[in-house]
């Protein structure tokens, strides 16, 4: 096939439509080491363990690359490493996109990562979920264009029949598991990412739903995206849709190539596939045999995949043991963390028994077309590496023919799948082979702004979604409103017409402290909702859907009118029924800011804890501490000096004192003691509460300060700590 004078020979026929394999994601010598504690002879010591060890490979553009292997092989770890979800400095090696080295930030801006769990709002419909995703990701497009894109995507994903169905959850009937997974995929491909990472996309699905999901991913790949997924035990029909396989074991590369190469790979190892047996399952069984062997491990298979050095047959191990016992042992160093570190097996037997020439029988076609040498990714072959990237096609008269690695089977080609967004390494971006290992500023500029919408635009979209969710789940808001209204009526009837006695004063103080406690405990039921929303936030912001600051502000603005209505309902009932003194507006403000403060505290705690059980425990524990030190049981002067600081940090102190000042900053008499009248000022002085008018204003400002502080802490946690990233 000739294209602008260039000869492109590496193509795959999809219903007789050639698709070039030029370009893709390449990775070199990826190593990820973690430190684990190990107990030896009763003592704990640190041990370095390689979760990934010197993995080099590639994922062709326009293809589905499946990462497979036994449990604990490092599949998800490799996926996280390629997707930039491992903290900077922890992962060693290079990742290149179309011949240019890229960092984690650049990968996130050109890719989408679909988690194994479907994190979606249950009370949004399929259309609304995808429409909000379009609003976040396709900012510059008009509303009409966004709707058209969403409608087209719904049709392509086979979701037309469930377009207006709620996503649903355990308590709400919604779409099926397969449809939910396709919605998750749609949310992350609405903007046409060049790279698509999926962690176990078929997990928990029946065979039909799993096949449907992979078919949609196949169509997405055929339109120019690089699709990389982890998968466990795919069916034979799904295997036919997988173009490129990467098989791992204990963090090492065991095999790389197409499905048809698996049998050839096993034959070169001296293993034959039994008739009718699945080649992939047979290879994984062989890997596990070596892994469970007491004398050799999967390292010999990794060496075979890397250099072509044939591993020993396990049936010949008696001969090998006899031979190695006749010579001085010199154990081969194994990578850190392997369970075979203490084995004394001498792998030099390979040179005597089963060493093969690297070029005689080893088929290097299973390797990346960008690297045709037996050694991995040396600087000397960087020029050859770049010849197969789109940016080099303009300058080469002829492209070398990479080995064929077409997948078997006939596929259905869909020309209407949304095209991938251009990567920063498209054909108009020329790369110098001398500096391709360092991402340039121009590649960053080529991508445009980091976020699709303006600050105000993001906040408005988030507010609209929040209001929609609140409208669909009125029980959370209405339950609090009903509780506060009911308790207001109860308090009004219980504390009506207090007597002008010391007991009457005590009763009125009890009313105020109960009111404060009621408002502080009323938001505890929101912990599960905030934790669920946090997981969705992590998924959406991992690839720059919106800013954490916009999310924080939108959440605050959305809840303010509902909190104000709750405070107003309670204040209006008890104020007039109990004939309270002082300005009504101040009484309302204290209650409203109390709700605002406790709401901010709850969302802050929810951003830290891993689950709602710990969230409930933490919120209740801290609220109890605030209650203990608010000044009701012991005045601020009577609290021991070493605990007095708790009175200042207790967020209940200020609304409690504020309500008392609003009621008792007066010379009116509220009772007598031994014939001496007790005025409102006397009550405040006995409780060591200020009698100045300015103290009322200061208390409100301090309460606002606590609410703002908790929101700032909430933002900091979201911005810097709530990242779905390995350390």
Curated annotation (Swiss-Prot):
It is found in: Cell membrane. Its EC number is 7.6.2.-. Its main location: membrane. It is an enzyme of class 7 (translocase). Residues 1-475, 532-559, 605-612, 721-727 are cytoplasmic. Residues 25-275 form the ABC transporter domain. GO terms for cellular component: membrane; periarbuscular membrane; plasma membrane. GO terms for molecular function: ABC-type transporter activity; ATP binding; ATP hydrolysis activity; ATPase-coupled transmembrane transporter activity. Keywords: ATP-binding, Cell membrane, Glycoprotein, Hydrolase, Membrane, Nucleotide-binding, Translocase, Transmembrane, Transmembrane helix, Transport. ATP binds at residues 69-76. Disruption phenotype: Stunted arbuscule phenotype due to an impaired arbuscule development during arbuscular mycorrhizal (AM) symbiosis with Glomus versiforme; normal initial phases of the symbiosis, including hyphopodia formation and fungal entry into the cortex, as well as normal arbuscule development initiation, including arbuscule-associated genes expression, but strongly delayed and impaired arbuscule development. Normal nodulation in the presence of Sinorhizobium meliloti. One of its GO terms (biological process) is response to symbiotic fungus. Expressed constitutively in the vascular tissue of roots. Together with STR, required for arbuscule development in arbuscular mycorrhizal symbiosis. PANTHER family: ABC TRANSPORTER G FAMILY MEMBER 28, ABC TRANSPORTER G FAMILY MEMBER STR2. Belongs to the ABC transporter superfamily. ABCG family. Stunted arbuscule (STR) subfamily. This is ABC transporter G family member STR2.
